[in-house]
Amino acid sequence: MKILASSTNYVLHNRLSNSQYEDARSKIVNFGGEFTNDAAKADYIFVNYSQINRVRRELRTIGTPLETCVSCKLIVKIDWLNEPKESLTPGNPYVIWHRKPEMKVGSPYTPSTRPASHTEAPNDFENHETPNTENNNEVKSIDNVDQEGSVYPTTKEYPYVLEIPRYACQRKTPLKCVNQAFVNALSVLKTCREVNGESVRTRAYGMAIATIKAFPLPIDSAEQLEKMPGCGPKIVHLWKEFASTGTLKEAEEFQKDPASKILLLFYNIFGVGASHAAEWYQKGWRTIEQVRKHKDSFTKQIKVGLEFYEDFCKTVTIEEATEIYETIVSRMPDGIKIQSCLVGGFRRGKPVGADVDMVLSPSHTHSTKHLVDVLLRILDEEFQFRLISVQEHSCGGKKGYVMLAVILSNSSKINRRVDIIVVPPAYIGSAVLGWSGGIFFLRDLKLYANSHLGLSYDSFEIINLKTGKDICPDEFNEWKDPVEAEKDIFRYFSLEYIEPKFRNTG
């Protein structure tokens, strides 16, 4: 059945698992259609939504507003692919939007004045992963709006602001931004959601923060903010409150709340998550000492977190981190050649951090396991240290390792957490990139690689989803400087190289 013959089709990845996404792509091809990774070129766009206003928003967030999809004839619920009995016409019940004959197809998305009567879609911020089914009567008028104006400002200095990129891996995100005061207030609310175990809301706040930090101009209107990826009505409402009062009431209440202070105290223990913090609070525990009385029942990581709690609360300076890193790499035996790099927040320009992360890779003449053994000897000779764990990872048939140790710093005499990542030569670029962060930069890099390139990326492998093969041994097998190896990954992904200091998404 070639019911999609001669059509070009796009699948909106949002709210689809990787397997569902790949299944949809396969069905499109089986039905005679062509698949494209560019929504702007598609005749049909398949989505896992039932409301067009949600689709409009998601298309905007990936940097392809519906107005730019000049080829699109229909937007179709993805369920149609399971039983395509009826042809795709505007009257099909699976079609949630069609291009009206009288609609003028314009040129690519350009700034214009937003209609004064336009009302934003219902707030989906508090329930980010499920469709909003409330206020259906209210959104019907929005469903019939064929064109929306853009309010993105654009300047010669910041041309990308015209359509701020959907993916954080395409944006420059500094450590401090021009809207930092608002970001700080939102970060308190993100922490509030995080310590209460609200992962969806935590992620939603994080997405908004990552976008706002990348915006290079002061936000001076709600209309300006609401067009940014991840900044829905909730964030706009908070901005209005902050713009008028200079603070956020909920953030202030969280910081003053006695229960929240205790939950945050527990949550900040190394190895402890939101569920443990809540459980301990429900048991009536209120101090670290009360928790320590029950340490025998905890995991190894939590025991370490409790034992070194006071030291782990003291931040590491970049000078101390560099000293620890240089001590380790300088003690390498002459016969072992390595490429290495200090990663984590310090590579992004943070002056202080919670731990010390580094990536090391031996030349082709030595195995990663041999390097791990050498590193253990160096740690034993140069520091008082305790090995917490050594995790093994597959790297295209070879082995990669993550060593977690607690060492007593020679300069500060404070116990520090140290992560040492050891990878084969072909994987130093992916490891340096993956361990340099920030969280939402990497999250969006993975989404971009998956949806646009058909690749599954992490620090230890890059898998071609069609073949199931790790591409690193073939594409990146040259042993080279970590920065150059990292740049190779960006080039392979067809992305502009973003310097680490501009990956501070949080």
Swiss-Prot record:
The keyword Metal-binding applies. Mg(2+) binds at D355, D357, D419. Pfam families: DNA_pol_B_palm (PF14792), DNA_pol_B_thumb (PF14791), DNA_pol_lambd_f (PF10391), HHH_8 (PF14716). Residues 348-357 are annotated as: Involved in ssDNA binding. The lineage of its organism: Eukaryota, Fungi, Dikarya, Ascomycota, Taphrinomycotina. It catalyses: DNA(n) + a 2'-deoxyribonucleoside 5'-triphosphate = DNA(n+1) + diphosphate. This is DNA polymerase type-X family protein pol4. Repair polymerase. Involved in gap-filling in DNA non-homologous end joining (NHEJ) required for double-strand break repair. Can incorporate a ribonucleotide (rNTP) into a primer DNA. Residues 1-98 form the BRCT domain. Its main location: cytoplasm. The keyword Isomerase does not apply. One of its GO terms (biological process) is gap filling involved in double-strand break repair via nonhomologous end joining. Residues 106-150 are annotated as: Disordered. Its cofactor is Mg(2+). GO terms for cellular component: cytosol; nucleus. GO terms for molecular function: 5'-deoxyribose-5-phosphate lyase activity; DNA-directed DNA polymerase activity; DNA-directed RNA polymerase activity; metal ion binding; single-strand break-containing DNA binding. Belongs to the DNA polymerase type-X family. Keywords: Cytoplasm, DNA damage, DNA repair, DNA-directed DNA polymerase, Magnesium, Metal-binding, Nucleotidyltransferase, Nucleus, Transferase.
